[in-house]
């Protein structure tokens, strides 16, 4: 008879005391927030004026309407710059206006003056860099507040958002904007609301 082969030993690890679990790795340090790219400073000398002479003449006439200097020196205050831009059909945010003005201090807005030659490159820059949202952008932004998914938002919530976020509107501005938009339940169809705003 052939000798018996020894049976393989069972894994001793199963019978031995379990090994201690390795210590958990230290939590990774929170990644620093990436730096926002710095906005390039506005440099009027690098702006190429592309308006026609006729357009420039029209702009000059509009600019002159805002001139409050005693001798009609063709100057406006920094604080009037946004108003003149908007009167000429542009729609810059207050932040954009302040950026092209070189981010003046609050007290400088009513004291510092600019002439038309200083203003024209600002107008050219703002008119070329229109970053206005599309209908879809606005609808998508309001859809966030559509809790029911039925195409409406609460009028009270929209009032609050318009008065407290981004470029805040005054109570009067909010009321004018929302006049006649709410249904009997205080809800607003936001697609119709965006069409109403964009048509204004």
UniProtKB/Swiss-Prot annotation:
Q: Which positions bear Phosphotyrosine?
A: 135
Gene Ontology terms describing biological process: cardiac muscle contraction; muscle contraction; regulation of striated muscle contraction; regulation of the force of heart contraction; skeletal muscle tissue development; ventricular cardiac muscle tissue morphogenesis
User: Basic and acidic residues bias located where?
Assistant: 1-14, 33-42
Per UniProt, the ranges with Low complexity bias are 15-32
Q: Which residues carry this modification: Phosphothreonine?
A: 93, 132, 134
Protein name listed in UniProt: Myosin light chain 3
Q: Which GO terms describe its cellular component?
A: A band; I band; myosin complex; myosin II complex
Cysteine disulfide partners in this protein: none
User: What do we know about how this protein assembles, alone or with others?
Assistant: Myosin is a hexamer of 2 heavy chains and 4 light chains.
Q: Which tissues show it?
A: Expressed only in ventricular and slow twitch skeletal muscle tissues.
